């Protein structure tokens, strides 16, 4: 654990303000506004992922039209290409990509460990071989922060020691948690622009709730502008995922934003909001819109090698490549206000499921249009969640949400969601 003590630790400047507007009277859900240097962000929020400063299937003008106020870039990829020198020369990632709203960047640690087989983690940092030329490289907490300072993102993440929650090595999980705390201290020391970039800490500890509590206490003591819960969405059981989120939000301060990293499936989000989380990100809504002509047989939400022409709708997902949609002349989602679904007399394209079926498998425009719909759907869903919290109707929202997906058949409601929501006062199985 770090040797920095509370008495010697200086207060960290903040480039954000966090206004709380409403809290659900039953669950831990909250409606807030996060004021950042490039605009105000309504919470809870889903953040689309523009990995390499480009969102798959959308221009930034189209992303603006969805109402998005905060999206992600990837520090690891931008550090490799275009590289730090180019980022410094152009004046940061906002100017590089022509995006005048907020950016959040991860630290690069997750990519080091998850994408590179030859990565080695030591106290110094993460050693790996460049995927471009095979040369040895080292990512330290200091270098990660330096890269993010050059990127100029509104929210930057500490470099943490990432290990899969499914790892059986408890000693390694504890080591990663302790090291993440020490690395946070190094990130804080290196951070040059706290008056315009907000450094978030990342809670680690695997599925061990005592380690999570310990990490929360250590991270909270360092008083970063916001807090992330990391190391989840890595194959753990949903019941365990919910326990970790619930445990952490019980400890984390009410007056700071809470970000659960890597979460993007609608069912996961609505439950995590009830457990007290505010911010979410995932590549799934854009990835699932893209169809490659490969054999099917795997789950597009978990197999990164398969991408499908799927539309996210209130009843789950529509696999528009299926022949059953070839003569379905309804919009992708009834009542959706995205430009694809909106009727022509309301300024939309008025596209049908039949047309999307026709172009999804062969035309790149199909992936483009589905991505517009999926991102719009996710952001619109977050708006409905927020309004339900403000109206103190979030419990009713949850019941309708799961009823819509499972066509009113409560026997099909996922047990993990039923159990997690019962723990915060919502019984999905009770008679309405």
List PLM regions with ranges.
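C-terminal extensions of enzymes
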Residues: 2-35, 41-50, 56-57, 160-167, ...
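Alpha-helical packing segments of well-folded alpha/beta enzyme cores
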Residues: 144, 176, 180-183, 187, ...
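Glycine-rich phosphate/ribose-binding loops and adjacent secondary-structure elements
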Residues: 2-8, 178-181, 190, 194-335
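Glycine- and acidic
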Residues: 165-170, 174, 226-233, 365-367
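Conserved, mostly hydrophobic/aromatic
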Residues: 39, 71, 106, 148, ...
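Non-catalytic, usually N-terminal nucleic-acid engagement modules in DNA/RNA processing proteins
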Residues: 1-193, 318, 323
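Structural signal for hydrophobic packing residues in well-ordered secondary-structure cores
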Residues: 152, 184, 188-191, 223, ...
């Amino acid at each position: 654990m770090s040797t920095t003590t509370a008495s010697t630790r200086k207060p960290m400047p903040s480039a954000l303000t966090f206004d709380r507007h409403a809290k659900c009277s039953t669950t831990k859900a909250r409606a807030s506004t996060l004021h950042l240097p490039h605009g105000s962000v309504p919470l809870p929020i889903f953040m689309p992922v523009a990995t390499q400063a480009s969102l798959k299937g959308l221009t930034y003008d189209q992303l603006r039209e969805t109402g998005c106020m905060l999206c992600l870039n990837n520090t690891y990829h931008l550090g490799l290409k275009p590289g730090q020198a180019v980022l410094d020369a152009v004046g940061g990632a906002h100017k590089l990509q022509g995006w005048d709203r907020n950016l959040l960047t991860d630290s690069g640690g997750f990519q080091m460990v998850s994408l590179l087989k030859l990565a080695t983690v030591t106290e110094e940092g993460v050693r790996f071989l460049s995927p471009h030329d095979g040369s040895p490289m080292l990512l330290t907490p200091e270098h990660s922060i330096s890269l993010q300072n050059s990127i100029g993102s509104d929210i930057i993440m500490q470099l943490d020691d990432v290990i899969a929650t499914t790892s059986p090595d408890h000693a390694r999980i504890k080591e990663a948690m302790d090291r993440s705390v020490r690395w946070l201290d190094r990130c804080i020391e290196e951070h040059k622009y706290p008056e315009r970039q907000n450094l978030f800490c990342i809670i680690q500890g695997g599925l061990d709730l005592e380690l999570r509590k310990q990490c929360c206490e250590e991270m909270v003591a360092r008083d970063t502008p916001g807090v992330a819960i990391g190391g989840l969405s890595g194959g753990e059981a949903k019941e365990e995922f919910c326990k970790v989120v619930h445990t952490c939000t019980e400890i984390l301060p009410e007056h700071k934003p809470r970000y659960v990293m890597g979460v993007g499936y609608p069912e996961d989000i609505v439950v995590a909001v009830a457990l007290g989380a505010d911010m979410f990100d995932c590549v799934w809504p854009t990835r699932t819109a893209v169809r490659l002509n490969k054999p099917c047989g795997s789950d597009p939400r978990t197999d990164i090698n398969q991408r499908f022409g799927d539309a996210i709708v209130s009843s789950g997902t529509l696999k528009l490549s299926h022949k059953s949609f070839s003569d379905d002349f309804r919009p992708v989602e009834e009542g959706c206000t995205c430009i694809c679904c909106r009727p022509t007399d309301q300024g939309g394209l008025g596209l049908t499921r039949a047309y999307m079926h026709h172009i999804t498998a062969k035309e790149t425009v199909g992936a483009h249009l589905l991505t517009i719909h999926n991102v719009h759907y996710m952001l619109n869903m977050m708006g409905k969640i927020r309004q339900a919290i403000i109206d103190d109707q979030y419990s009713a929202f949850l019941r309708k949400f799961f009823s819509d997906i499972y066509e009113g058949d409560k026997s099909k409601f996922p047990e993990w969601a039923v159990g997690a929501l019962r723990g915060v006062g919502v019984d999905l199985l009770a008679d309405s």
